[in-house]
């Protein structure tokens, strides 16, 4: 099975290429990067000190024609462009990009009518196990506990809160029979007054090279429960994405990591 990697010269792209090269049963079919990138025209393994035989291209159509599945951790506008080309060519897509609007996320179902699409705000097996723990806790602690979600990422991340943090908020809200849009508080400043009952607060930290830390805090009177996941490297994301690519190859429909992991 051949896999194409979008954003091939980036940190995540390089991790994905390395993971594909080390995974039995899959090969690197194409490596895509933005027009003007210094990586275009070079072997996809140059930064890794490896020779892959795959040349980085900015021609999306040419690249996707050489692959069964595209793994995309880029930006929303680029991902949507890739999805359009993939649909025309019948190439499945694994989406790890975050920062989509609600309308853009809703469009994934339409793409799934023609090709296989896996979309998840986080591909890590550990994070998806954490999602399940949060769901259980949210049901048990539905009364008498305030919910706060704290996330930290590196200084280069461009969206906030993170897609993973938002997913955690959605899980809490849905487990308690509500909608995140009705409960979310994304900023506090100045004299905010007492905390409003039932809200789900978000706090965002950006700095250094933090790969990704997420904590859901259930704060009650006299006790608090914290469920935390910390990523030390991007390797778990890459391994989960390749696992998702193997799962979705040859399928149609919209899937998430619960489907991939059989949760």
From Swiss-Prot:
UniProt keyword terms in alphabetical order: Amino-acid biosynthesis, Cytoplasm, Diaminopimelate biosynthesis, Lysine biosynthesis, NAD, NADP, Oxidoreductase
GO cellular component: cytosol
Swiss-Prot/TrEMBL GO biological process terms: diaminopimelate biosynthetic process; lysine biosynthetic process via diaminopimelate
Active site (record annotation): 153, 157
Binding residue positions for NAD(+): 7-12, 33, 96-98, 120-123
Catalytic activity line of the entry: (S)-2,3,4,5-tetrahydrodipicolinate + NAD(+) + H2O = (2S,4S)-4-hydroxy-2,3,4,5-tetrahydrodipicolinate + NADH + H(+); (S)-2,3,4,5-tetrahydrodipicolinate + NADP(+) + H2O = (2S,4S)-4-hydroxy-2,3,4,5-tetrahydrodipicolinate + NADPH + H(+)
InterPro entries for this protein: DapB_C, DapB_N, DapB_N_CS, DHDPR_bac, NAD(P)-bd_dom_sf
Molecular function GO labels: 4-hydroxy-tetrahydrodipicolinate reductase; NAD binding; NADP binding; oxidoreductase activity, acting on CH or CH2 groups, NAD or NADP as acceptor
Record pathway: Amino-acid biosynthesis; L-lysine biosynthesis via DAP pathway; (S)-tetrahydrodipicolinate from L-aspartate: step 4/4
One Pfam match: DapB_N
EC number: 1.17.1.8
Alphabetical list of PROSITE patterns matching this protein: DAPB
Coiled-coil region(s): none
Location relative to the cell: Cytoplasm
Binding positions for (S)-2,3,4,5-tetrahydrodipicolinate per the UniProt entry: 154, 163-164
Annotated positions binding NADP(+): 34
Cross-referenced Gene3D superfamilies: Dihydrodipicolinate Reductase, domain 2, NAD(P)-binding Rossmann-like Domain
Record-stated family: Belongs to the DapB family.
Function, as annotated: Catalyzes the conversion of 4-hydroxy-tetrahydrodipicolinate (HTPA) to tetrahydrodipicolinate.
Entries under HAMAP family matching the protein: DapB (MF_00102)
Name of this protein: 4-hydroxy-tetrahydrodipicolinate reductase
Organism: Ralstonia pickettii (strain 12J)
């Amino acid at each position: 099975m051949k896999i194409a990697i979008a954003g091939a010269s980036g940190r995540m792209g390089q991790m994905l290429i390395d993971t594909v090269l080390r995974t039995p049963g899959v090969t690197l079919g194409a490596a895509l990067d933005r027009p003007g990138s210094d990586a275009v025209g070079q072997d996809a393994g140059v930064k890794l000190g490896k020779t892959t035989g795959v040349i980085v291209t900015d021609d999306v159509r040419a690249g996707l024609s050489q692959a069964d599945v595209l793994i995309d951790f880029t930006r929303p506008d680029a991902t949507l462009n890739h999805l359009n080309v993939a649909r025309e060519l019948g190439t499945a897509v694994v989406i790890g990009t975050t920062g989509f609007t609600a309308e853009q996320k809703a469009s994934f179902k339409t793409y799934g009518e023609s090709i296989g699409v896996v979309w998840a705000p986080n591909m890590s097996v550990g994070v998806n196990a954490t999602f399940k723990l949060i769901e259980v806790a949210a049901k048990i602690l539905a009364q008498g506990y305030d919910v706060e979600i704290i996330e930290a990422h590196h200084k280069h991340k461009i969206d906030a809160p993170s897609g993973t943090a938002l997913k955690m908020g959605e899980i809490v809200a849905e487990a308690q029979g509500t909608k995140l849009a009705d409960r979310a508080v994304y900023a506090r400043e100045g004299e905010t007054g007492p905390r409003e009952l039932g809200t789900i607060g978000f706090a965002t930290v950006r700095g250094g090279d933090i790969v990704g830390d997420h904590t859901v805090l259930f704060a009650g009177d006299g006790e608090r429960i914290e469920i935390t996941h910390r990523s030390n490297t991007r390797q778990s994301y890459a391994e989960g994405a390749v696992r998702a690519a193997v799962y979705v190859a040859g399928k149609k429909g919209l899937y998430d990591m619960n489907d991939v992991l059989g949760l």
